[in-house]
């Protein structure tokens, strides 16, 4: 008898609405989904399907109207803001489509920036040497150590995304959330970023949840979930085993 896979991250009955001019706009309408430890999963859907809103809830950047978010066996959506921030800062790395690098800082300074912000001046001065060594190691991990003193204006889009990935790894997170990580890149550069994410997943055993509108990108994941109009349409497509030429095709299951 096979045991169920261990879930690192889970959404249970998640609902979320926003209000405009006294009109309620439902964005998520009851999402149940789990992400397996050590796997690379994809949430795929068109713009407006609710996938980015779900990612914000999974990252504790926002709270659901109802439902629960569980991380590594602990419910986190109902924690205090300070506690949610602590979870996110220590356990969850996040990258976005547009990198969000500070233009006046070098690559290594951008990687160090979150660690600087989270510490007092004295705390940063105390930990400065070890933090810099960690930042250098993360830039080396993404193949950009030789560009550590270049500013974003001196880097390509792919290089800037690599810096963003290095920054997300500074806290040695268990989970990486990637919101359209190749959406601002050409096809060839996007493929190199996907290859890097897969390498981090397989070699470093980093659990990754990737948000995308592109089926071809979603098909590189171990499991794919399709969202439409705030609902999860698909059963997970397990792409880890079997013939990928067949299994890598997303099946649309009627909601």
Curated annotation (Swiss-Prot):
Descriptive protein name: Lipoprotein-releasing system ATP-binding protein LolD 2
Species for this entry: Rhodopirellula baltica (strain DSM 10527 / NCIMB 13988 / SH1)
GO MF entries: ATP binding; ATP hydrolysis activity; transmembrane transporter activity
EC code: 7.6.2.-
Principal location: membrane
Family as reported in the entry's similarity comment: Belongs to the ABC transporter superfamily. Lipoprotein translocase (TC 3.A.1.125) family.
Assigned keywords, A-Z: ATP-binding, Cell inner membrane, Cell membrane, Membrane, Nucleotide-binding, Translocase, Transport
A single cellular component GO annotation: plasma membrane
Subunit structure: The complex is composed of two ATP-binding proteins (LolD) and two transmembrane proteins (LolC and LolE).
Annotated positions binding ATP: 45-52
ABC transporter domain mapped to chain residues: 9-254
């Amino acid at each position: 008898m096979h045991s169920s896979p261990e879930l690192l991250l889970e959404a249970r009955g998640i609902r979320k609405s926003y209000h405009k001019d006294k009109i309620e706009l439902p964005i998520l309408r009851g999402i149940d989904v789990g992400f397996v430890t050590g796997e690379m999963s994809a949430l795929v859907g068109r713009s407006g399907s609710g996938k980015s809103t779900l990612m914000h809830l999974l990252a504790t950047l926002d709270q659901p109207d109802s439902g629960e978010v569980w991380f590594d066996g602990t419910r986190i959506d109902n924690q205090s803001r300070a506690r949610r921030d602590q979870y996110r800062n220590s356990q969850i790395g996040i990258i976005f489509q547009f990198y969000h690098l500070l233009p006046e800082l070098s690559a290594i300074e951008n990687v160090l920036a979150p660690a600087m912000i989270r510490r007092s001046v004295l705390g940063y001065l105390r930990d400065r040497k070890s933090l810099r060594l960690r930042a250098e190691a993360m830039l080396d991990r993404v193949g950009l150590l030789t560009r550590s003193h270049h500013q974003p204006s001196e880097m390509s889009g792919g290089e800037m995304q690599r810096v963003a990935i290095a920054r997300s790894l500074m806290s040695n997170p268990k989970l990486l959330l990637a919101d359209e990580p190749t959406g601002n890149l050409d096809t060839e550069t996007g493929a190199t970023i996907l290859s890097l994410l897969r390498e981090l997943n397989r070699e470093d055993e980093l659990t990754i949840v990737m948000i995308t509108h592109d089926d071809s990108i979603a098909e590189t994941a171990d499991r794919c979930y399709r969202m439409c109009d705030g609902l999860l349409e698909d059963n997970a497509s397990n792409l880890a085993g079997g013939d990928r030429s067949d299994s890598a095709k997303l099946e649309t299951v009627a909601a």
